[in-house]
Amino acid sequence: MFVSKIDISSPSFETNTKENKALLDKMNLLLERAAQTSEKRRDIFEKRNQLSPRERLGALLDPGLPFLELFNMAGYCVDDPDPETSIPGSSLIGGIGYVSGVKCLIYIDDSGINAGATTIKTIEKGLLLLEMAKKHKLPLVHLVESAGANLMQYKVELWALGGGAFAGLAEMSAMGIPIITVLHGLSTAGGAYMPGMSDYVIGVKENGMAALAGANLLRAATGEESSDKDLGGAEVHSKITGLVEYLAEDDKHAIEIAREVVKSLGWDRDFTGVSARNFLPPKYSSDEIIGSVPTDSVSYTHLTLPTKSGGGGG
């Protein structure tokens, strides 16, 4: 039996609690900043008959079940070093949640922020999400709408890291882990490889598009006149190239199809479950953790002691 050496009435415990709660409040405000910034483009989404990125997330997940967002502070004070204006998340919403009863890795381009443009931190975050999917054998569901690489912040490292993302997709395919992609909007340049390397692709009529170059770049490079829809619209890919397996009427319909695809995988059919072992409740309250950990990196702390079980099973 471990006995905690933490004195919850000590000045240091009170200081730690106060400082850690302040940090949590700050983080939540920053996450709300990201959500509000994305929400500013709601009028544009509505004009296109689209759902916003967070509405897509809500429609995809099973109601009432938990969603664990991962790496939500990625990119903060990196591309924009000003803490008063910097937006965390790297234009990407990622995490683990339940889709049609199946635990999945969720990967959503936040096209409400810089049109979902990709930076180095976006790719680094994406690579970590892919590693999570591979390690835990989680089906990957990617809701795509991105302007591609941010060429205004060009760095050669971006392309090297991007290649790592494609390698990760190939490894997932080799492992038999399903990849489901929904084309909600643009997916150009390197972004077009994502649906190309997926097992199931759902494209939204009129809005979904995947091509190595959009119409404007094609015109600038060759002088040829075309449209995004003719170059790589969802209709073209569903009827001619074969990239798109399912053609959806709108975002809501596309996500309904994605949920049906995940359900049809039978991913958990051979999983018999694990019986929970009997255990006694912890001797110490989990509320003590926040006051046990100092905010500076110099002070020591008894990390394990407050969370030890009161006895019985492990």
Model-derived features: where do they sit?
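N-terminal amphipathic, basic-rich helices that act as targeting or association modules
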Residues: 1-93
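Hydrophobic/aromatic residues within transmembrane alpha-helices
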Residues: 13, 49-52, 106, 145, ...
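Glycine-rich anion/phosphate-binding loops
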Residues: 86-90, 116-128
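A structural preference for short, pocket-lining loop segments at secondary-structure junctions
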Residues: 93-110, 125-152
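Flexible beta-alpha connector loops of hexameric P-loop NTPases
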Residues: 114-120, 154-157
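Conserved catalytic cores of soluble enzyme domains
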Residues: 144-270
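Terminal amphipathic helices with adjacent charged low-complexity linkers/tails
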Residues: 250-296
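Conserved small/polar residues in nucleotide/adenosyl-binding loops
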Residues: 301-307
